[in-house]
Amino acid sequence: MMAKSVYKTVIFGAGQIGQMTARLLSSPCQLLCFADNDPHKHGSYIGNIPVCSPDAAAALLPDLVILGVLDEERRNSMIKQMENLGYHGPFRDPSVLRMFDARVAVMRLL
């Protein structure tokens, strides 16, 4: 079986980690949206990428969901939430961003 040429991707979490992940994302990922549990963010845009509810994101039938948080407990909760919404594809976490965690902490202080 051949690998997909483009992966329809959702980043779950529209905060700083999710946004940083989006900036580092490259092909073969097509970023469909940010999913977020904060209803005040729904309908807004980060750059040209829409922010929607997790159920709206699951309805887009993504091939991949990147979890835009570093906290393991929150990631596990997000995985369960997406699975309950019918998404059963792969999840990735932004573990590569752990090296930037100190920068994120400094950014929060600014």
Which residues are covered by each model-predicted region?
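A short, basic/flexible loop-to-alpha-helix module at the beginning of a structural domain
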Residues: 1-2
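Glycine-rich adenosine-cofactor-binding loop
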Residues: 5-25
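A general structural motif
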Residues: 6-7, 31, 61-62
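Short, solvent-exposed amphipathic alpha-helical segments in soluble enzyme
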Residues: 24-30, 82-84
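Secondary-structure boundary/capping residues
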Residues: 30-31, 43
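Short internal beta-strands
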Residues: 32-37
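Phosphate-bearing ligand-interacting subdomains
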Residues: 39-110
